[in-house]
Amino acid sequence: MSGSLDRFARPCFEGVSSNDERRERRSDFEVSEDEKKTRIGNFNFKKKAAKASSKLRHSLKKKGSSRRRSSDRTFSLTIEDIHDVEELRAVDEFRNLLVSENLLPPTLDDYHIMLRFLKARKFDIGKTKLMWSNMIKWRKDFGTDTIFEDFEFEEFDEVLKYYPHGYHGVDKEGRPVYIERLGLVDPAKLMQVTTVERFIRYHVREFEKTVNIKLPACCIAAKRHIDSSTTILDVQGVGFKNFSKPARDLIIQLQKIDNDNYPETLHRMFIINGGSGFKLVWATVKQFLDPKTVTKIHVIGNKYQNKLLEIIDASQLPDFLGGTCTCADRGGCMRSDKGPWNDPEILKMLQSGGPLCRHNSALNSFSRVSSCDKPSFSGIKASDTSTAESGSEVEEMASPKVNRELRVPKLTPVCEDIRGTAISYPTDSSEYDSPMVDKVVDVAWMAHEKPKASKGSEDTPDSGKIRTVTYIWRWLMMFFVNLFTLLISLALPQREGHSQSESSVDGPNARESRPPSPAFATIAERNVFSSVVNRLGDLEKQVETLHSKRHEMPREKEELLNTAVYRVDALEAELIATKKALHEALMRQDDLLAYIDREEDEKYHKKKKVCW
């Protein structure tokens, strides 16, 4: 076990004093809990004993009451983080492999990042290494590490009009809440104000900001490790207009980027305002998903308010979703970017640049693992103007420029000390007076929750695909494409047999005979989706061909039509002549009637004269 855990024997720095004076090093093995409390008494830590099956509670304190500049401040921070000893070993083995092949940049030397990739590939080291190497190559080709300096998204306000989305607040467990109003998305107008390439770069930039700024800020605010988010999708009004060909192409590209490079970042998802049509979508799609993945996604109708309020406090939920927040002073909830990442004190801790040390201990029935994390730091250039509103507090940590460098702590490469009945690996610790993160890892609690034999079993390849909001768009697209194809097949009897043969693939008998392999389910899903997309592409090509053709009429029909037109013209001329003759006859008749009346009057007068 010592060979696999050599990395955890690195020294841990628990603090840096103002005069940088090094204190005497002592190993955790040699120092009792009482001595530790005495040694760090100046930090005013309050450690509470916990059982092996319970989580330890931690507190965040700030040393000193006077306000000094950030370079003179000392923060002490304890973050709750539960590790599994088997996961620690797997991450260490994976890390050693990456180091040996020069595939571990300092900015990615992070326990939780590597763990997410391992979970995405079900702890298969070979597949995880391939996924990791592809991610490293993508970051280099895409320029991800310098995207904050190289790219500015000036059209953000216009994009937000036609694609309402953004983070707003945190849930009751401290995770950031991401909201999208898919029914209000207008892909045509969206592509008028930006391009696909620029939108993809904006998407990556925001994901980097979330991973490097927002999630660490949530960790500090919640005093526990957080590396995933809660998502709310409002699908009211979603229809065929949302699934044009450019929109589908964009969704597929975003989904591939998220799944390949930012795995396991979704904690739970709520799909609200889903009507009967969308429920049909969900009933179809969830057949291809792992049951544990299905438990993460909650499809709710229009009575979603109570469910959301169980997870998210009303003050953190926008009013249009049943909460009380309006963010009137920030242009509305979708523009406010509300969250702990805008808190000046938290930003000071993120920007201070001091080493945050994590002291971890993992307990199980066989050994006690004590570990200390010495995280790396990366400069992140943030352009969030909302952090510039802080008065004297922000003046200590921010320049007057909107774009500034943030020193973001990476929260976890692990150095460990194993304590057991037979062997022990003492970890030296040096004390400095600096910002510090203290973590306690209770593996027995995790072992009680799930058997170690099933580690990683809940993270199947299917669950790795349902991580981002863009995948839901893919589900919606699959449903509407299938529905459209079904209608066409019903209208064309000659293709009925072909349609039935395809639909029988997903029938109950086929599902019963399908082997219970997650890989098979993934392949089946990909085959169904690719075949549907291909058929839809063929239909679109045919429609475009019909639109591009000129509507030409055969010569014979054109001659007949011209003859008929000429005949109609002749009939109209004859009708006009007939009307004229009839009018003249009527005039003549009126003249004759008037003449007869005059003659009768004259005869009457003559007879009257004769009588007199």
UniProtKB/Swiss-Prot annotation:
Its main location: Golgi. Residues 555-588 form a coiled coil. SUPFAM superfamilies: CRAL/TRIO domain (SSF52087), CRAL/TRIO N-terminal domain (SSF46938). It is found in: Golgi apparatus membrane; Cell membrane. One of its GO terms (biological process) is protein transport. Keywords: Cell membrane, Coiled coil, Golgi apparatus, Membrane, Protein transport, Transport. Residues 155-329 form the CRAL-TRIO domain. SMART domains: CRAL_TRIO_N (SM01100), SEC14 (SM00516). Residues 19-36 have a biased composition (Basic and acidic residues). One of its GO terms (cellular component) is Golgi membrane. Residues 16-36, 379-400, 498-518 are annotated as: Disordered. It is a peripheral membrane protein. Required for transport of secretory proteins from the Golgi complex. Catalyzes the transfer of phosphatidylinositol and phosphatidylcholine between membranes in vitro. Belongs to the SFH family. This is Phosphatidylinositol/phosphatidylcholine transfer protein SFH5. The lineage of its organism: Eukaryota, Viridiplantae, Streptophyta, Embryophyta, Tracheophyta.
